[in-house]
Every structure is written in structure tokens, then in C-alpha cells.
């Protein structure tokens, strides 16, 4: 029997609630507009993550980039000006190929890079062979840019299923979703983006933001977001660091 594992970190008291929610939603893909499930695994099952330790004060600002020429550099400038040297950028490799200088700066500034595949296709609609082909192409592109040993994957379009998780496991990727959605790509207004993040954020959260050209208000919202995170006593770390010291417990969803 195939098994799909759902983890939640250090919240044993919420285990029953998590199991009920997971059973109710297990047949659905994970999309940007949906409330994400806590999806984790042991070494014996598919692996994904949406949140770190809830008892921690660490959080992770993550930025997706799949297209555009105008937003990434200003966002990097804003992060640097506000003392953030450890964000996590999930890059489409086709975009990275066209912007080698920006990729080099992301690394130089101290940020972590994760993959969003190559062609920004919906992996949930692809056969395993097609997913592997795209992952291989992305891996080759990143290696040519000097970015090696990428360990994090955020599936293109934000959608994934059991098959995607299984293929990602074969490549030793940890699939990363998010627990706080800024909705910045919808350009709802600077104050709304700030509220979407700061009104619900807590320890362990992975925050979804964008540095593609579609996200026109993110740069302006960032200083207030960072300031309010600090006021709450929260500290930004890379996703890699966020999950590195996690003490997780598992529950099986069949």
C-alpha cells in the first residue's frame, strides 16, 4: 500500500485536528489560493514542508521568481537596506539563465536558492518522466551558473501531488510550500500585502512573496513587513536553517 505522510512540528496537542483536516483535503492539489496543509514525511515517504517549529521565533521570507526584468534587483536592494541577508529565493531555471548577474548577486548577498524547475510547468499535470526531464534541465542550468547542491524545490505554479513528491524525493529535494500567503502577486495594495503577512505570522512560518514583475507592490511593502516582524520578536532565517533543527512527529495518511 502506498502511504502519504503528514507532519506537524512540535504541536502534538493539535494532532487530531491536523489528521481530520488532512483526511478531508488529501485528494486536493496545493495551490496558491488554497489554505495549505502541513505536509511532511519520514524517510519512508514523500517529503514536503510548509512550516518550521511553532515554538521557535524563526520565520522564512521566500520569494518566487519566474519571469521579468524589473523587480528582482530592487527587492534585493530593499532586503539589504533592511538587514535581511538570508531570504530564500525560488527561481525558475529558465529565468535564471537569462539573469546570471542577478543570480550571482542573490548568492553574494547571502540568500539561499531553491529550484522551481525549468519551464514553469504544472508538475501535478505531468507524468513522472516529464517532471524528471524538467528537473534535469533545471539542474543543468543552475550548475552552469555555479549554483550547485540545491536541496529545496517549490513546484512551479505551487501545485503538487503524491507523484510530484515521490519524484522530488528521488532527487533528494525537500518540497517547500508556505504557511503565510502575502497574495502580493495580485497587487491588492501595499497595506493589504503588509496585513496579509503580519496579521497572521507566527514562529515557524514560511512566507510566500514574489520578485517577478507581476508583483508590483512587494518592494514598497517589504520595509514595513520586516519592521513588524522584528517588533514581534521574529527572526528571518533561510528555509534550510528553518527546517534543519526541526523536531518533527509524524502521522500517517493512507
UniProtKB/Swiss-Prot annotation:
Please provide the record's keywords in A-Z order.
Answer: Hydrolase, Signal, Sporulation
Q: Which domain of life is it from?
A: Bacteria
Question: Subcellular localization, per the record?
Answer: Forespore
Q: Name a biological process GO annotation.
A: sporulation resulting in formation of a cellular spore
Query: Which Gene3D superfamilies has this protein been placed in?
Result: Glycoside hydrolase/deacetylase
The segment(s) forming the NodB homology domain are 57-237
Q: Got a GO cellular component term for this one?
A: intracellular immature spore
Its Enzyme Commission number(s) read 3.-.-.-
Give a GO molecular function annotation for the protein. Answer: hydrolase activity, acting on carbon-nitrogen (but not peptide) bonds
Signal sequence coordinates? 1-24
Q: Which InterPro entries does its entry note?
A: Glyco_hydro/deAcase_b/a-brl, NODB_dom, PdaB-like, Polysacc_deacetylase_ArnD
* Keyword Hydrolase among UniProt keywords: yes
> How, per the record, is this protein's activity regulated?
Negatively regulated by SpoIIID.
Q: State what this protein does.
A: Necessary to maintain spores after the late stage of sporulation. Might be involved in cortex formation.
Give the protein family. Answer: Belongs to the polysaccharide deacetylase family.
The identity of this protein, by name, is Probable polysaccharide deacetylase PdaB
Species source reads Bacillus subtilis (strain 168)
Lineage, top ranks: Bacteria, Bacillati, Bacillota, Bacilli, Bacillales
Amino acid at each position: 500500500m502506498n502511504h502519504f505522510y503528514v507532519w506537524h512540528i512540535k504541536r502534538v496537542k493539535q494532532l487530531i485536528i491536523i489528521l481530520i483536516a488532512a483526511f478531508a483535503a488529501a485528494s486536493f492539489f496545493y495551490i496558491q489560493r488554497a489554505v495549505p496543509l502541513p505536509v511532511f514525511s519520514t524517510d519512508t515517504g514523500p517529503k514536503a514542508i510548509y512550516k518550521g517549529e511553532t515554538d521557535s521565533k524563526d520565520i522564512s521570507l521566500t520569494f518566487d521568481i519566474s519571469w521579468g526584468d524589473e523587480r528582482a534587483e530592487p527587492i534585493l536592494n530593499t532586503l539589504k537596506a533592511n538587514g535581511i541577508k538570508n531570504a530564500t529565493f525560488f527561481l525558475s531555471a529558465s529565468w535564471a539563465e537569462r539573469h546570471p548577474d542577478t543570480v550571482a548577486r542573490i548568492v553574494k548577498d547571502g540568500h539561499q536558492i531553491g529550484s522551481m524547475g525549468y519551464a514553469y510547468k504544472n508538475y501535478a499535470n505531468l507524468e513522472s518522466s516529464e517532471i524528471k526531464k524538467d528537473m534535469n534541465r533545471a539542474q543543468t542550468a543552475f550548475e552552469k551558473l555555479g549554483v550547485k547542491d540545491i536541496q529545496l524545490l517549490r513546484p512551479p505554479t505551487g501545485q503538487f501531488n503524491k507523484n510530484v513528491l515521490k519524484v522530488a524525493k528521488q532527487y533528494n529535494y525537500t518540497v517547500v510550500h508556505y504557511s503565510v500567503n502575502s497574495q502580493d502577486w495580485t497587487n491588492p495594495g501595499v497595506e493589504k500585502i503588509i496585513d496579509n503577512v503580519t496579521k497572521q505570522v507566527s514562529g515557524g512560518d514560511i512566507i510566500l512573496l514574489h520578485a517577478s514583475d507581476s508583483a508590483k507592490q512587494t518592494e514598497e511593502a517589504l520595509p514595513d513587513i520586516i519592521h513588524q516582524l522584528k517588533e514581534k520578536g521574529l527572526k528571518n532565517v533561510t528555509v534550510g536553517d528553518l527546517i534543519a533543527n526541526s523536531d518533527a512527529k509524524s502521522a500517517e495518511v493512507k
